[in-house]
Amino acid sequence: MHGLQFGLSQAQTNYWIHRLLPVLQQTLVAIEMTPERDGESVATNRETSEGGANLAIAGTERRLQRPLDPVRQREKYSGKKKAHTDKNILLVNEHTKKVIYLSATVEGKKHDNRAAKEAAIVYPKNATLAKDTGFQGYEPEGVLTSQPKKREG
């Protein structure tokens, strides 16, 4: 898809992605825009509390090519997306709209709630956390959580 927008072949697109990705990563580090990758460091990150510790948690999935190995197929298959996927958990500061935390990649069949618990995210004191229905039952200690109610009708 990236190559189609610029009239590049798959080989050219692959070359440029691998050539420019390290530059992008270095730039993000230089301007301090990389998210935490360690759940225990979230509470001490200054950007977490910027504008108040109003945070939102979300699970994000991206499609994969179907694995050939039947065992890997079962691990990667997401019933929610009806496809083979990988998943990450994101934590966003609702005030600054910055991604504060990006979890390790997990298999698509793992539920958002379980992936968040396994990430062992440590939240700052008096934080508020907005979550969707995928995190029902996820109640981190010392955090005020809110979940939207389903509309009736």
Stretches found by the model and what they are:
Residues 1-153:
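Short, well-ordered secondary-structure "scaffold" segments embedded in the functional core
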